[in-house]
Amino acid sequence: MLYLHDVWVNWFEGEENGYNVCHFYEWRKDDTIELLDQVPLLKVDATLYHYIENELLELPQKMLEDVHHKAYIRKNHERLQQEYCFVVTDGKGIIAIDTIGYNVPIRKSRLIPRQEQMVYEMVENVQAEKYEFQVEETEKEHHILSPSPFIMNGLTRKERQLKQLLFMALDQLHTTKNTAEIRYWFTEWDPSAYGMVQHMEFEDIWAKLYDEAKTGWSDKHEQLCERLVKGQPFFEKLWEMENEQKVN
């Protein structure tokens, strides 16, 4: 088995979508960075890699057995054994996984560029391990609270976070079924549509607003998000957390 040593990780917990597991250049000063003293490295095929990176589903039992108790974390000068922790690659993508004792990839992290390069060199002439696992026959369903990667492509960490906050606010707005309110918000988004929305029903206006807002990210998106979350303590807190950040 291959091993990496002194690996810096920045865990993102409970992320089913790989786009939310930030690459090194998006790490922040207040992120909690940990040091893996030793961690096993596995090469798998692209299908299994994508499954691990973009799902929160059960890992192959044989894979868990292969990495069991083989990773150590360095904390306060102590070397602590980890239950199921490993780095996995298909030769293109690379991700570190810690199940925190479960059989699903609860915590995920990217590596720093120097260590990514080391992984590529180590696995270049290595055959991918074969593990049996169940792939869902149906394609993964994305929805407003778990957006498709296509909707998030090209955005910075801050933009992704704010876009997901906007979607959460729009989802909550959908539960109100308040036609006057949705007409107001669509007019905020597009003042020229004032006359048009007066003759539309709630569901049609909401669907049109979501359809237009899900593309890209701009000052217009940010303004709508800020106005929608105003007066809602939980959403306001999320907004403030992102806007305290000076970068990303």
Swiss-Prot record:
Q: Which family does it belong to?
A: Belongs to the UPF0736 family.
Protein known as: UPF0736 protein BCB4264_A1231
Q: Which InterPro entries match?
A: UPF0736 (IPR020909)
What Pfam families does the entry give?
Answer: DUF3603 (PF12227)
Native source species: Bacillus cereus (strain B4264)
Its domain of life?
A: Bacteria
